[in-house]
Amino acid sequence: MTWRSDDIWIELITGSRKISNFCWALILFLGSLGFLLVGTSSYLGRNLLSFFPPQQIIFFPQGIVMSFYGIAGLFISSYLWCTISWNVGSGYDRFDRKEGIVCIFRWGFPGKNRRIFLRFLIKDIQSVRIEVKEGIYARRVLYMDIRGQGSIPLTRTDENLTPREIEQKAAELAYFLRVPIEVF
């Protein structure tokens, strides 16, 4: 979502609370829970899953391996659920021509650096840069080059923008900030 006036441009950034992350976390949780239940059923010799007889899988080595995969999957699933609940990567980009300041804010993982807040002067922005990598995994990323600071990505790498969309976004931002556009 973007909010824009004559002097201020605020762009909200979606973090890890995306439908695809919810789907992957749920699928991974259910699959790993199934693996763990099958491994536990083979160890106990009791049927914990009604549609799967435990006698078909012996505990050593199949039951151990399935239990290991189930536990590993639960750890990965809990990591995904934590990133979703903390909304890692969300935030905003604020460009204020009136004050001459650019503020970039992102939420990180809990701890000392939970809040990532970068502040720059607009006069320190050298250019808006588009980096394009074509191929099977095409990638188009919009960067802001800051004098003495390097490049700061403004779009996520998984944000699959078409060439027209990324060009339009770069042109609007460069026009708003009154800086040149570079394409790599």
UniProtKB/Swiss-Prot annotation:
Task: Name a GO CC annotation attached to this entry.
Answer: photosystem I
User: Which region is the signal sequence?
Assistant: none
Keywords in alphabetical order, please: Chloroplast, Membrane, Photosynthesis, Plastid, Thylakoid, Transmembrane, Transmembrane helix
Biological process (GO) annotations held by this record are: photosynthesis
InterPro entries on file: PSI_Ycf4_assembly
Could you tell me the membrane topology recorded for this protein?
Multi-pass membrane protein
Does Transmembrane helix show up as a keyword for this record?
yes
Which Pfam families does its entry note?
Answer: Ycf4
Query: What job does the chain carry out?
Result: Seems to be required for the assembly of the photosystem I complex.
Family, per entry: Belongs to the Ycf4 family.
Protein name, per record: Photosystem I assembly protein Ycf4
Write down the species: Solanum lycopersicum
Task: Point out the gene that encodes the protein.
Answer: ycf4
